[in-house]
From Swiss-Prot:
The protein's name: Pre-mRNA-splicing factor cwf24
Compartments in which it is found: Nucleus
Zn-finger segments (RING-type): 254-292
Native organism taxonomy: Eukaryota, Fungi, Dikarya, Ascomycota, Taphrinomycotina
CDD domains: NAT_SF (cd04301), RING-HC_RNF113A_B (cd16539)
GO terms assigned for molecular function: DNA binding; N-acetyltransferase activity; ubiquitin protein ligase activity; zinc ion binding
Pfam families assigned to the protein according to its UniProt record, in alphabetical order: Acetyltransf_1, zf-C3HC4, zf-CCCH
Compositionally biased region (Basic residues): 27-43
Organism of provenance: Schizosaccharomyces pombe (strain 972 / ATCC 24843)
Mapped zinc finger ranges (C3H1-type): 184-212
Amino acid sequence: MEQKNLNINQASGSKINTELAVPIFQSRRRHRPRQGLKRKKGFKRDDDSGGSSESSNEDMRDNIPIVSGRKKTVRLNRLQRESEQFENSALKDINVEYQSNLSATGESVNTTTVSAINEDTREVILGRPSPKLANQSTLPTELFQSQNDYSRFLPKRKDFEKKSQVGPVLSSNASTVRMNTIIDYQPDVCKDYKLTGYCGYGDTCKFLHMREDYKAGWQLDREWDSVQEKYKKGAKLEEGMVKNEKKEDIPFVCLICKKDYRSPIATTCGHHFCEQCAITRYRKTPTCIQCGADTKGLFSVDKNFDRLLKNRKSKNDEAVKQKVGGFESNNSATTEVSERKDREASFQGFADTLAKPNTSAQQKMPSLGDNSNTIISKYFIREITESNIVHFKRLVRVVLEASYSDKFYRLVLKNPDYARIATFEDKFVGAISSLVAEDNSLYVTVLCVLAPYRCLGIGSLLIDHVKKTAINNNIDRISLHVQTTNESVIKWYTAHGFKIVKQINDFYRRLENKSAFYMVCPLSAHNNIISNH
């Protein structure tokens, strides 16, 4: 209603009532205080007049306009924008091209018109270093020069060989670093350092750097054992007995001549022979007849050997006084040769009784571990096994002076029925081995007896065992080869039923006499005799 009245009054030209007017609020923009916009005092120059007062300076600062830090943006109208775009498009239409093959050199440049302030600028323009005059001297060292000129005065680092560097190499920056190295040395001496005095590992080598000689453990043990042998109970050697050598190991005759020792000598392997016999054998072969080792022609006189023979002879004389064959021998002066004849006679008497049927029980010696042992007094034969194959090899090498391959000894072990080894007082003195051929015959490959134990019936015992085994296996004959010059062996085989069939030349390739007799023994004629055995 009031608004309607107001409109009516205005239309009628009446005076407007101020009490009914609408209030209008307008926020006034606040300005920054003028005192905070005062400039700082500038740097006072010397030429400024000192009479000017501070009031005049303040009036001048008031007249300086204040520049705002905000960038003022100016808006362009349409005409200005079109003119600016036209100028930019005109610049784009203008295309400037150039081409150069860079073939110009410094010599083609006209040097007469080139002037430079210093030598460096001239070298850049001309493209070549400027020649120095002969009388031009270098600058004194007191003047300042460029860094390149000073670098040539620095001393060069001397070259060093890398081989001379041993051990851990530290960097130059680690001069203040302290290092403790602990090396666990092995109980061995460095071989390189001991021989040459130089080791590539240096201080890091785990072996000891010593050049002295030290005894190994086994050497110390050997010396200790040799000292302790003197204090062992019952270890005292007999007077005249060689150290570490039993009395039974020395044959009572020379193995080469089969006679008593004459001027006995000892070889490097510890065996004794006659001096003349050893020299004669060395001319043919350098091996020892007893062990097969190389003597190298070195023989020495054993001073205790004669005394040892006398001690053994005295003990044998005492043994002869005992009962032999039911009677006591009162001959105290019996020699070793007579003793051997007595043993041969006793063994021959036992062999004669063996040919006749005997109903009395035979007393046997205790066996040494083999099941099928033939016991005959002190002599008996065993099967060849892995435990005694070494003794079989030694007999073949010493008696026959032959060396067979391992394949041959494996064949001997595969045919245990036709291979035996004879022993005397636990010593291996003889052996025999045979192989079955394809024509149902038996071929004797080895038959050997040591020289001191021959003519005692050991060889006959071995060949009779092979014959008996062959007859039980229905084998017709036994064959073998004998050297034509070995008359005693040919006579022995003939006495045991062998006959010469033919002669073969060049049978033994490594012997001087290479011819051999091929001998055969038929088993049909020996059936009755062997069966009684």
